[in-house]
Curated annotation (Swiss-Prot):
E.C. code: 2.8.1.7, 4.4.1.16
Name assigned to this protein: Cysteine desulfurase
Subunit-structure text: Homodimer. Interacts with SufE and the SufBCD complex composed of SufB, SufC and SufD. The interaction with SufE is required to mediate the direct transfer of the sulfur atom from the S-sulfanylcysteine.
Pathway membership, UniProt: Cofactor biosynthesis; iron-sulfur cluster biosynthesis
Key words, A-Z: Cytoplasm, Lyase, Pyridoxal phosphate, Transferase
Sequence positions bearing N6-(pyridoxal phosphate)lysine: K226
Disulfide bond residue pairs: none
Amino acid sequence: MTFSVDKVRADFPVLSREVNGLPLAYLDSAASAQKPSQVIDAEAEFYRHGYAAVHRGIHTLSAQATEKMENVRKRASLFINARSAEELVFVRGTTEGINLVANSWGNSNVRAGDNIIISQMEHHANIVPWQMLCARVGAELRVIPLNPDGTLQLETLPTLFDEKTRLLAITHVSNVLGTENPLAEMITLAHQHGAKVLVDGAQAVMHHPVDVQALDCDFYVFSGHKLYGPTGIGILYVKEALLQEMPPWEGGGSMIATVSLSEGTTWTKAPWRFEAGTPNTGGIIGLGAALEYVSALGLNNIAEYEQNLMHYALSQLAAVPDLTLYGPPDRLGVIAFNLGKHHAYDVGSFLDNYGIAVRTGHHCAMPLMAYYNVPAMCRASLAMYNTHEEVDRLVTGLQRIHRLLG
């Protein structure tokens, strides 16, 4: 299938709107991607004609809704090449998935004197849950430091592991720098030391294929809303043997086998024992539509188009005076920058006046900001629906801001 950005853009209604009298150039998909009509329509159709509470219902609507939900679990397992659909837990998003692991697996396996390894480029969602776990049990949090070019100091990694290392929690792709970490060698090293590996895939799954079996990671987590799906839904993959050993972290309906006031409660099997309460069934249906949409386009086709667009953007941005770019030349999805000494919020506000949407702030990565000694950065993110013309508008906008502000 030949990739056509014009055909893709036609599927996204919001891309036809104007902002401040100018065509919208949406360069903020790393925060949250826009939704194609196929996703919007699938979720709307479910609520119009197919909605019912899932699980245990004997009536037709409930049975059909349950089947649709479980079919999405199967589709998601194929999307990341899991061995079984029962290795996938529906979660609200990447943040909840990481917290689930920290509170279930972590509480059961991390003890006083143990340690967990993260990196300096992590999103707060892959820092704070581990800080909280370490504080609860008396464990140590160790950090892989950054290089100035936005890559990790991988030569330090072997020195961080020891017999007390229980987990390496690492991002697949940095949400600020676009750095893609060499997971294969990092996971191999972790397993050689008897540690498990959790991968934050929030910024990876929309850019190229992910194969969790080939990676051999123990946990992999991502969100639907960055993958052109709805908010409030995500996927946590856990190797089956691990998942079956993990206790539930939330109690309620749907995750029990039996409940007795005198004899206590027993749990249903995984993954359902991690899905307490009424699920976000509409969001799950929308996620399924997003996975189907992206798969039909072909992730390899998307990757090729986006990489060409990224190379073009980096080459054009080199012509902007006083522009500081952060991150390595080979990157995925995002371009973080500052313009002279101007605050990122000011630059972002000017760009918004030109109809260009970028993200400004610390991007939930304060330790990374501290490393670069800046309070904030602007971040333009490139998705499969962005164009060379939108990159040109960004470059022109930054040149105009430089002339205005000096």
